């Protein structure tokens, strides 16, 4: 982990975003194209109305942001969540330490659990980040077109309550005790 911490620190300094003790913020990664949350608007509204999450969760489409802005979001957070995909690589940049827990939630499209690689679980372990995983059902627009193949579509319909409960557990973990 020491090499990863040095790398994370160097990148943070390069972008001018290195934080010593970021807030208990959670960045939820949204996607465009494949593996989107089809009920994203409802889910975001539910998070906004959830007193456990509304003040700490921010949503971002990383592919629409400059790299420095992406780095600033993550360096100012303690947790990251999203549907399986390369945006979760930012898990390596969460400022985890023995006295500063961080967390990652990887949402797998149904059918992905056995064939999805363990990259983000392994990356979390290397960075001492608590790894969490949820499986969510493929959206109807995938099932009709691709016979339930997450590789061809991968769009999901999230169970808002289930995902929000997991996010709340993560926020509780990363929130400093008073």
Per-range role (PLM):
Residues 1-178:
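The feature primarily captures lumenal catalytic ectodomains
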């Amino acid at each position: 982990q020491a090499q990863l911490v040095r790398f994370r620190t160097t990148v943070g300094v390069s972008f001018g975003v290195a934080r010593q003790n970021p807030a208990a913020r959670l960045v939820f990664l949204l996607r465009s194209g494949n593996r989107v949350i089809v009920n994203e608007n409802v889910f975001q509204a539910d998070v906004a109305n959830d007193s456990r999450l509304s003040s700490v969760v921010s949503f971002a489409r990383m592919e629409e942001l400059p790299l420095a802005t992406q780095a600033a979001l993550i360096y100012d957070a303690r947790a990251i969540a999203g549907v399986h995909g390369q945006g979760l690589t930012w898990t390596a940049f969460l400022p985890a330490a023995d006295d500063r827990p961080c967390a990652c939630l990887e949402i797998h499209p149904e059918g992905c659990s056995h064939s999805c690689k363990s990259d983000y679980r392994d990356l979390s372990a290397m960075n001492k980040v608590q790894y969490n995983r949820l499986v969510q059902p493929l959206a109807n627009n995938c099932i009709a077109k691709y016979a339930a193949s997450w590789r061809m579509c991968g769009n999901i319909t999230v169970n808002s309550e289930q995902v929000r409960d997991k996010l709340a557990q993560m926020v509780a973990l990363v929130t400093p005790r008073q």
